[in-house]
Amino acid sequence: MADSALIYLAPGAFQDALADARVLFQESRADSPRQGSLGEALEALSGRAVNLVVTSAEALLTGVTLSRKQARHLQRVLPYLLEEQLLEAPEQLWFASGKAEHGRYPVAVINRPNLEALIDLCREHRVRPQSLKADADLLAAQTPVLITVEGWGTLILERDQALVADEAQREAVLALHGDDELHFTRLEDPATLCDQLQAALAADHGVEMLQGAFSQRQNQASGPSPWQPWKPVMGLAAAVFFIALAAVWAQQWRYQKAADETFAQAAELYQS
């Protein structure tokens, strides 16, 4: 995963046409990140496995404390446990959980139709989504974090406390912290930002949202096949083959029937 391609979607990526959403993308950690639309990034990375990162504006990061017995039914109970934190109907959301620490499970929640649209767009471009995580989750170990890359301005105070904001809003929040501002991890250019995200992905930080029905195996199994363009031709060839086979079988049956009749007639003549 350390050398996988990266696509980092800007805040508000799902508000308009998804293919036109602004992204930072990187073919590998050794390459310089580029800015463009999601459609352009997927076109450039066609045939590749890609790590996808969304901002905290698109994913709710939280956690729940459960006993082992309760944890057996984690996926069933999450919508009820998080009901007060949800701004959308549970059936419109996808819930993903990570490994528990001292009985507390980290949870990531994302809009399900948005997730499905993102995966479908990847498949259209023959790109295999390998991972989907939130930036605040990946950078949680470095908090507080200040991202000042144009279009990605974000304040991450803790894993579950992040604010996507413009420069004026960020300055207002920073003013409340006074001298604490000096302790912020500052990510001020695309190269540094992508490098930190790639390092966190390589270290397997954060909750993986592509699990269950959206797992990597499912994405790979249902992804585009190189034989897809040939399927109509293969189907026609198969139909022609079976028609020809049926014709040969019918012809053999007629020959066999004629041979049997000839043999029967010969036997009658011989007996007479």
What are these regions (language model features)?
Residues 1-272:
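Hydrophobic/aromatic-enriched cytosolic interaction surfaces used to assemble or bind macromolecules
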